[in-house]
Amino acid sequence: MLRNLLALRQIGQRTISTASRRHFKNKVPEKQKLFQEDDEIPLYLKGGVADALLYRATMILTVGGTAYAIYELAVASFPKKQE
């Protein structure tokens, strides 16, 4: 059993230490230029279509959740009639 645990430990270390190193291009300066431009476009639209859809979905869920909470508070404020 100890041998199995040691083998498992070695496999875990091997996969972490010998994983291929991927070099990603630093996109931060490009994004900074994009978002710092003064072109009268709202910030939440500068990210493209995905950001616009995410913003709209967030707004719809926020407004819908607020309306639902107010509705439930209104329903809870009126006691049910007992017959």
From Swiss-Prot:
GO molecular function terms noted in the UniProt entry: oxidoreductase activity
Topological relation to the membrane, as annotated: Single-pass membrane protein
Subcellular localization(s) per the UniProt record: Mitochondrion inner membrane
Xref: InterPro entries: COX7a, Cyt_c_oxidase_su7a_sf, Cytc_oxidase_su7a_met
Keywords noted in UniProt: Acetylation, Membrane, Mitochondrion, Mitochondrion inner membrane, Oxidoreductase, Transit peptide, Transmembrane, Transmembrane helix
Family matches, as Gene3D superfamilies: Cytochrome c oxidase, subunit VIIa (4.10.91.10)
Principal place of residence: mitochondrion
Record topology, Mitochondrial intermembrane segments: 78-83
Mitochondrial matrix side: 24-48
Transit peptide: 1-23
Signal peptide bounds: none
Residue ranges of the TM segments: 49-77
GO cellular component, one term: respiratory chain complex
Pathway: Energy metabolism; oxidative phosphorylation
GO terms, biological process: cellular respiration; mitochondrial electron transport, cytochrome c to oxygen; mitochondrial respirasome assembly
Positions of post-translational N6-acetyllysine modification: K33
Function, in words: Component of the cytochrome c oxidase, the last enzyme in the mitochondrial electron transport chain which drives oxidative phosphorylation. The respiratory chain contains 3 multisubunit complexes succinate dehydrogenase (complex II, CII), ubiquinol-cytochrome c oxidoreductase (cytochrome b-c1 complex, complex III, CIII) and cytochrome c oxidase (complex IV, CIV), that cooperate to transfer electrons derived from NADH and succinate to molecular oxygen, creating an electrochemical gradient over the inner membrane that drives transmembrane transport and the ATP synthase.
Protein name, per record: Cytochrome c oxidase subunit 7A2, mitochondrial
Species this chain originates from: Homo sapiens (Human)
GN (gene name): COX7A2
